Structures are given as structure tokens and as C-alpha cells.
Amino acid sequence: MPQPTKGPRLGGGPAHERLMLANLAAALFAHKSIKTTETKAKRLRPYAERLITFAKRGDLHARRRVLAVIGDKTVVHELFTEIAPLLAEREGGYTRITKLGFRKGDNAPMAQIELVLEPVTPKAKPAKSTAKAAPKSKAPVEETPDEPASEETAEAEAD
């Protein structure tokens, strides 16, 4: 028999939490950015990224699985046709959470969660062969200073 998750839930029961996360995900996909509490944003992030991964697959089964969660055909269509192609090259990290401070009234910590729609720029990897080709010498070459010899000759002349 499956055991329910332990610990506090958003909104009370597990069904309410599922519905709340589905509504937050639908709002995120519709508006590309939403303002909510930090706790809700942190719980929404893996949920939304999983739905985006389904949308990147783009097949009928993935569309039906996302539709079973969100339920709004227009939002699902926008996710599959507009958002998923923009995130096709990205391998994860589709969302960004920015802390905004505290809400007036109940002092709840607020955050903005948004989709990262900027194109991915591949990082330049340093060439390993050039790093190995020029090994550093372990023993530094020390030059003999000329000044101590001149001081000795100056002392010898003074005597």
C-alpha cells in the first residue's frame, strides 16, 4: 500500500497540493513568470521542469500526460508549440527563482519563478593538449647576485 509523503504539505491535503501546483504550473506557462511565496516556488520548480521535459518529447502520449495534470488545452498547446522549441537545446534548468523580499501584511518570503527562455551558449572548453605540452619546470633557476661580490671587494679595498 503506498504511503503518503511525510511532512507539511502546501494547502493542507495532498489533493489540494496537487491542484495548487497544477494551477501554478499553468500560470507559469501562460505568463512565463509568476510571483509567489518561496516555498511554493521551490515546490513548483521540479514539477514544472518535469512537464517541460514531457513537452520537449512532443509525442501524443506526452501531450496527454501533461493534459492530465494541467487540464487547460490552450496552456498545453502553448507549452508544446511555443515554450518547448525554445528550450529544446537546454538539458535542464528551465526555471529560475529570484527572491523578492517579504510580503507586506503577513511577512511571507516572496519569490519570482520564471522560465529561462534565453538561448544556450556552449561553454568554451580549454584544450587539454596545450596544457600538457607546456609543463612547468619544477626547479626554478636562481641567478647569482653580483652585489655581494662588489661589497666584498669594497671591504677589501678599505682595509
Curated annotation (Swiss-Prot):
Coiled-coil spans in chain: none
Region (Disordered): 119-159
GO molecular function, one term: structural constituent of ribosome
Gene Ontology CC entries for this record: cytosolic large ribosomal subunit
Biased composition (Low complexity): 119-138
InterPro entries from the UniProt entry: Ribosomal_bL17 (IPR000456), Ribosomal_bL17_CS (IPR047859), Ribosomal_bL17_sf (IPR036373)
Keywords from the named record: Ribonucleoprotein, Ribosomal protein
Acidic residues: compositionally biased ranges: 143-159
Gene3D superfamilies on file: Ribosomal protein L17
Domain of life: Bacteria
GO BP annotations listed: translation
SUBUNIT field: Part of the 50S ribosomal subunit. Contacts protein L32.
Family note: Belongs to the bacterial ribosomal protein bL17 family.
Name of this protein: Large ribosomal subunit protein bL17
Biological source species: Leifsonia xyli subsp. xyli (strain CTCB07)
Gene (UniProt): rplQ
